[in-house]
Amino acid sequence: MSESESEKAIWTPLKIIQWAVPYLTQKGIFHARFDVECLIAHALKMDRLKVYLQFDRPLDPDELTVIRELLKRRALHEPIQYILGTREFFGHSFKVGPGVLIPRPETEQLVELAIEHLKDIPEKKRLVLDLGTGSGCIAISVAKALPCQVWAVDVSENALQVAEENAINNGVSSILWRKGNWFEALKPQDISQFQLILSNPPYIPLNEKPQLEPQVRDFEPKEALFGGESGLEAYENLALSLHQRLLPGGMALLELHANGLNRVLPLFEKTGLRGTAYPDLQGHPRVLKLEN
């Protein structure tokens, strides 16, 4: 849809959809229909389903300009979540943008397991550490589910700013934010051991980079995606002291690469931790539970 085309024709949401879906599909965008509807709704500042009620409403020039710019961004494979500025996770809305990893549905399993574990722990002993918090989706979802004290760590100042904003927007005030690399980010006045340690670390091997979708490979933060040549760098760092950071009877939950279990588990077994893997909906080991 060029500017000259938009000036001559009367464009409606339906006509935009009929034109833009094949256009984005040709550009290699999956779920193009859904994305187009979301972008129209975003431009018109309404719920996506309400767009259906206004399929035949003529769009004014300003609305067309906004929609055209949004479609251009999506055609370049910019993630739809970055364009919209939000991502739903565990029933909550999280702000996301460049420099912040987009929460994945697979990570909700880790949150579910965390909440189940904490239910059996007295409230005062619910001491939780989230390593590599990103948008804060894990820490905030756990803190919203039940009373607990959470420390959330990330090496990215940008990610921490977004995470803190997400906590405010979700009504969570029980999280202490720490900038730094893994356990090194904790301050001297912080506690040294936790009942529950959570992490969705970077675990994609660098040799898989060419196979990733452009919207992931070219836009999401590399430090949150790639775990070095082997994909194990983050786990190797965690294994150095994770066993010392767990309270007696404590537990860690780590997200895994679909093929990562047999390479990750031995790193922690060497330190005396016992591991149990939980499969995702595709049957791949997705969450590793570690206990002392």
List where the protein language model places each region.
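Mobile active-site "lid"/loop adjacent to the S-adenosyl-L-methionine
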Residues: 203-233
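Conserved hydrophobic residues forming the short capping helix/wall of the S-adenosyl-L-methionine
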Residues: 24, 118, 167, 242, ...
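Conserved AdoMet
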Residues: 41-117
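Non-catalytic accessory regions of SAM-dependent methyltransferases
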Residues: 1-46, 50-52
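Conserved Class I SAM-dependent methyltransferase catalytic core
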Residues: 229-290
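Conserved SAM-binding loop
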Residues: 103, 130, 152, 227, ...
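Conserved SAM/SAH cofactor-binding pocket of Class I
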Residues: 109-211
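Residue-level signal for inorganic ion chemistry
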Residues: 39, 77, 107, 138, ...
